[in-house]
């Protein structure tokens, strides 16, 4: 009898725990994805803060030339970064217990792998949590689908690209200047500016900014006034009101006359779908482009593609970009190899005499 009561009590305790985890009445929804999201993001955040402040220099290129990234080792907010795991580690899983000491783990850039892997797990679970909360509330699942774009982009630069290049040392450093360095080196090695998927991403981000500004300004300019002239029109909105807060017909008429009739949406639902889909699809394509360039399927090469009748090269902007790429290639990792791959692979010119 005692055993039966104890079993009921424990089952009830588990049931209460499940109800609390999945309750939509909590101030912040936890969910089953949140059970994994909370510890992984807390771990990534806390290790990032500690390492950004105090991590010792990291031998990123595996040539016994450590690079400093933390504030206590001479950096500021702009130049500081979590330095990627050493090329000597490559793609090996490198937890603390795989190193001979904590000093060795820090020297080889172990914190980078720890932060990145926990961060990617955390943001993936955040996306799952968005879907889970939408499901509990009877909403459609498109919030999580939209969030998949930045998740895909982060996964591309922190995981897929290092896998394709063979080392976590090629991942994006976790800092401002480190991000710029990653972008410059990526351009030098893969010519990303000439990749059509990157072009789609630029159109997605800049277009999304433009459409967001256009939509916000149109709505703000066509509010239905519920206040006197002496009060702000914004004060006329009551949270949860059933009435439309702006006149979509007026906004449609304005924009249709500004551009042309069919450039303006007359359906609020398709308008907002478009506002969400445009940047999301663009960022999906960029993430896909990074993932293909990870395996060296690079941007277009139009170098020396225009020649005159005598066979002399007429330079185009593609040749100017190529010259810049060579300069960036020469300057990065300048002690890791004697010649950049692009230059070392060119046959030596013939010398007469």
Curated annotation (Swiss-Prot):
Residues that bear N-acetylthreonine: 2
Entry's transmembrane regions: 29-46, 118-133, 142-156, 197-218, 274-288
Swiss-Prot/TrEMBL site (Stabilizes free radical intermediate) positions: 190
Subcellular localization(s) per the UniProt record: Plastid, Chloroplast thylakoid membrane
Residues given in the record as a quinone binding sites: 215, 264-265
Record: residues binding [CaMn4O5] cluster: 170, 189, 332-333, 342, 344
Site (Tyrosine radical intermediate): 161
Cofactor, how bound (note): The D1/D2 heterodimer binds P680, chlorophylls that are the primary electron donor of PSII, and subsequent electron acceptors. It shares a non-heme iron and each subunit binds pheophytin, quinone, additional chlorophylls, carotenoids and lipids. D1 provides most of the ligands for the Mn4-Ca-O5 cluster of the oxygen-evolving complex (OEC). There is also a Cl(-1) ion associated with D1 and D2, which is required for oxygen evolution. The PSII complex binds additional chlorophylls, carotenoids and specific lipids.
Binding site for chlorophyll a ChlzD1: 118
HAMAP family: PSII_PsbA_D1
Subunit structure: PSII is composed of 1 copy each of membrane proteins PsbA, PsbB, PsbC, PsbD, PsbE, PsbF, PsbH, PsbI, PsbJ, PsbK, PsbL, PsbM, PsbT, PsbX, PsbY, PsbZ, Psb30/Ycf12, at least 3 peripheral proteins of the oxygen-evolving complex and a large number of cofactors. It forms dimeric complexes.
Protein name: Photosystem II protein D1
Organism in which the protein naturally occurs: Psilotum nudum (Whisk fern)
């Amino acid at each position: 009898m005692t055993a039966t009561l104890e079993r009921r009590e424990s089952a009830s305790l588990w049931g209460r725990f499940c109800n609390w985890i999945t309750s939509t009445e909590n101030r912040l929804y936890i969910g089953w994805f949140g059970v994994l999201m909370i510890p992984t993001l807390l771990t990534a955040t806390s290790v990032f803060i500690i390492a950004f402040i105090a991590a010792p220099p990291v031998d990123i290129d595996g040539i016994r030339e450590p690079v400093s990234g933390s504030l206590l080792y001479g950096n500021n907010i702009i130049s500081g970064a979590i330095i990627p795991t050493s090329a000597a580690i490559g793609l090996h899983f490198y937890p603390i217990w795989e190193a001979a000491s904590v000093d060795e783990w820090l020297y080889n850039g172990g914190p980078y792998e720890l932060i990145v892997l926990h961060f990617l797990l955390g943001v993936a679970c955040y996306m799952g949590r968005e879907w889970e909360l939408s499901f509990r509330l009877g909403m459609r699942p498109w919030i999580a689908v939209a969030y998949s774009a930045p998740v895909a982009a982060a996964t591309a630069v922190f995981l897929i690209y290092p896998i394709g290049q063979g080392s976590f040392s090629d991942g994006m450093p976790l800092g401002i200047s480190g991000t710029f360095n990653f972008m410059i080196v990526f351009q030098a090695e893969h010519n990303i500016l000439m990749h059509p998927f990157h072009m789609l991403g630029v159109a997605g981000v800049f277009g999304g900014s433009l459409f967001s500004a256009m939509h916000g300004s149109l709505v703000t300019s066509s509010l239905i006034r519920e206040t006197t002239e002496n009060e702000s029109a914004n004060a006329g909105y009551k949270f949860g009101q059933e009435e439309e807060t702006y006149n979509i017909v007026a906004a449609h008429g304005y924009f249709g006359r500004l551009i042309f009739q069919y450039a303006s949406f007359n359906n609020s639902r398709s308008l907002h779908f478009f506002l969400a889909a445009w940047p999301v699809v663009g960022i999906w394509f960029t993430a896909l482009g990074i993932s293909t360039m990870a395996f060296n399927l690079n941007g277009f090469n139009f170098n020396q593609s225009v020649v005159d009748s005598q066979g002399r090269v007429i330079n185009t902007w593609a040749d100017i970009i190529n010259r810049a790429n060579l300069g960036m290639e020469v300057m990065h990792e300048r002690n890791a190899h004697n010649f950049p791959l692009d230059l070392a692979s060119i046959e030596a010119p013939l010398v007469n005499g």
